Structures are given as structure tokens and as C-alpha cells.
């Protein structure tokens, strides 16, 4: 079914600079300058995704929009002034390191506000019925950012900022946030850990980032108990494991919660080519996962689904995964063929691995009363 799908994008988000790094290591001492590329969180994966959308003919069939930056009032609903002032000071003084794995350059504060503003505008357009669903190509990402601490390439909590603005201005009630970035959505979890009006679900590689974290036992605190679900998957997990986790835990949890809006923190770093993880997803995995959640949104909240870009660091492959997601969101199939699809499908884990992972997923589903 063809939908009116929004794509929120601004060239200036590509101008956020992460400085001179070799993947994630600052150049200096024993770390040599890279022969090519640079920091993993470069603009190229996002730019190339948009490029492929353009040449495929998909972009003109979408509602292409930009947005105003998130306001100081928007930011203050999540972040204290002391943090925002420190962030802006470093940005104004040419950049530096704001937190763990959080390098920034000149002007990064204003660009981060724009990144959050794109997410806010996408949420508002869907809630107001201007669009059926939407995608925000936000950069820098946001799902690792704590209220007073940046980390993991994230400086502002894009999705919580958008959610809280919609609650304040549009009366939004219950929201479900699904994070399928391969790294745990620790920032979003922290912000909503004590709340029962926001369901947070993170699917991630066990122990990847933050290093050593799995999170099965972190299920919320106080009023929020039971409203935070972590699904750690073993390194090497592929299409079967991720889609089974959605089918067995995520979709039933959504049905039980009955949200008014579903947001996906959409990272592509669980793809088989990513340098910062060890998973085995391909473009059709992301296509099918998007379709699964969109179908749930159709049943539960009038189809209201917003996706906000997070990670994904394989410049050659993220564009194919991102295009597959946009095709699934919009209901428009292009002529583009994924040149690595068959190759990655042949690399999928053997049945014994998939069965072992399914058993772990079943146990977790039982603990949450979903089986």
C-alpha cells in the first residue's frame, strides 16, 4: 500500500565534524592517521543513503521537508542548562571532546539542535495527520545521550526531545520507542526508566556498547517497572534471530501497551558489513522489520510510525539498507538491487545457532508475560 511518507533532511546535518580519527580512535601517539575515511560517524553513510534514494527515483515520490532547529525550551525538557552551556561553549571554541566517544567540531551545537528539530517536525507532522509516516535523517544521532552526558557520538537526545515536545504541545499520550541500533539505547532507557507512559524496547548486540552491557534485568523503576525491555542478542545473530525477537517480544509488547505513536530509533549497524558490530543482517532484514512494525502501527495507532536515524557505519552498505526501509515505509518499490543480498544470506548462522538464540528469546518473552 502506497503511503504519504515524509523524509526530513537537511544538508547542514552532514557538516557536523568529528575531527581526525581512525574509525573511533583519536589520531596521535600510537594511532596512525587513516589512509582514507576517518571517524566512523562520518556523514558519508547518510549522504550516500540520500544519494541512492535520489538516483533510484524514490525521493521525488516522498514529502521532502526540512525543519527549524529544536528550541532551547525543547532541549530543556530533557537536558539541564549546565550541560547545554558546556556543549555550546566547546562548539563555539572550535570543538573538542564533550564525553566518552563524543568528538565535535565548530558549529556542532547548532547542527545538533537541527538534528533534534528534524525529529520533532517528523513526529508533529505524523501526529497532525499531515503524513502517514515519516523518516528523520538526523545527524548527529541521539540514543546514547544522557540528560547531562554525551557519549557514543550522541550530543542531544533527539527522540526524547521530540516526544516531550509533542506531549507538551499536542497532548500526546502513550508512546513506544523501539531501538534496533546494534548498540544499546542507554540514553533513551535512562530518560524513561521511571515512566509508564513511554515503552522503551532495545534490541542490541550483547555486550557491544556500552561495553559489557546486556540489560535483561533492567526493566524499569517504580511506575516504570515493566515498561523497559532489553533484548540482547548474541554476536553473529542474523535475520532469523532479529525478526523472531520482533515477532515474539516486540510486537506482543506493543499490542499490550497500545501506544498512540510508535518511534523507531533506526540504526543500521546490525548489518553484516558494519565495522562497529558483529551481526548478520541484510537489506531485506531491515525491510521486513520495518514492515512488521508498520503493520503493528496500522492495527494499534492508525499507522502512526516515525523512524529516526541513529547509527550505521558501512558506507558501501547502509545506503541499500536505508533504501529498503524507505521502500517499506512508503510502499514504493524501486528498481535498485542489493548487490550483497545473496552473499549475506549465504553467510547466515546455521540452524543450531538460530535455535539456541530463539530459546533465549522465548525465555525472555516468558519473563515479560508475552508467551
Task: Describe the function of each predicted region.
Residues 1-8, 13-20, 85-371:
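A general "terminal functional-core" signal
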Residues 1-77:
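N-terminal low-complexity, Ser/Thr- and acidic-residue-enriched intrinsically disordered segments
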Residues 62-99:
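Cationic, histidine-enriched alpha-helical/coil surfaces that engage anionic ligands
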